[in-house]
Amino acid sequence: DELSVTDFMRKYGMPERINEEVFISMAKALDFIDPDKLSMTVVLTAMNRFLNETDGLQMAFLDGNQPDRLCEPMKQSIEKNGGKVLMKQRVKEWVLNEDDSVKHILMANGEVIEADEFISAVPVDVMKRMCPEPWTKMPFFQQMKQLEGIPVINIHLWFDRKLQNVDHLCFSRSPLLSVYADMSTTCKEYYDEEKSMIELVFAPCSPIAGGKTNWIAKSNQEIVDATMKELERLFPLEIGKKAPDGVGAKLLKHAVVKTPRSVYAAVPGRNKYRPSQETPIKNFTLAGDWTSQKFLGSMEGAVLGGKLAAEVVSAKAKGMKTAGLKKINDDIMAEASTFSGQGWKRPQKMEDESPVVFGAGYVLEENDEQQLMTIDPEQLTEMDGRSQATKDAVQEAVLNRTR
């Protein structure tokens, strides 16, 4: 885990062509970053799964959109078994008891939620912002300072004709594009024999991930223009002036979904800081793909992290022994002994309206960007094409962060 993919290659004398033919596309697909930034552990873990699991190489798509085809059936199952799912509820803070256990959750609307057990499944950057101050002094939670989510952009493109495609997820070595698929072929809900709907991942999209441009700070139109230019280079016979008809496929509409902090950046040396699902807080458990488990920061990792969190809660409820806390690295223990509160990202409030506050991907409007500035101004350091008011707000947010 201490070596990047490129460092690993050089150490063991692997030719550069392997990087160009294999690792660039793997790195961008697995963690949305370039191989010189990615821990080799991520690639080896993925290859191990591919080779040792019966269906390890198979790719699967939902047959429709995620809220309806995945989330709604889960919600119905919970409600059928007596549970309740509350939507669009914003947490203001976790209120603690004297022993630092959770007393209740205070919602933005003033409601108080009491429970025997509490589980957090938010992204690591959101967890860092919401972490109660007494917990920030604990070595267990200080591990989170070593983990940082990276930005990613998903782009949806609707064309006026059917493009040549394969019924599969495609991996790219493009400097801008990561993975893509023609959803009109791969997904039942979007099936269309006449027109293509391409979904792709735009990555790396910031210097954090190895990119040269902070695309999160660019306008949606700038991102779409760059994407179309790259697609024209990759598919000259279908898109652009080199197509047989001299025009190529016409873009009918588009959607740009930005996730300012997505999966944690699996850069070298980070894996040892992923915390266990069990925490030092007796009634609080962590879930999420960034917690310690065999998979990467991914949907698979999120599912497994949730399963392990459920096992912790279930074992405690039955009075059974749990797996216990993961050993904390020595450097974290040493730092915790002299912790002064510096370096912990904590915005003034957490009840803002925009979904990006809680780690969601979103089609950002200007008001969403201004809320993003409050919690993560580094994401919007380049504001070409934005209003002067927005630029001024960025500068003010950065100043407030450094004061």
Predicted regions and their residues:
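A conserved FAD-binding loop/helix module that cradles the flavin
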Residues: 291-313, 317
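Active-site/ligand-binding neighborhood in enzyme catalytic cores
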Residues: 1-103, 108
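Active-site-proximal substrate-binding core of FAD-dependent oxidoreductases
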Residues: 314-391
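A short coil-to-beta-strand element that immediately follows conserved catalytic motifs
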Residues: 87, 238-258
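Mid-domain catalytic core of redox enzymes
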Residues: 89-211, 219-235, 255, 351
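FAD-binding beta-loop-beta segment adjacent to the flavin cofactor pocket
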Residues: 188-192, 257-286, 290-292
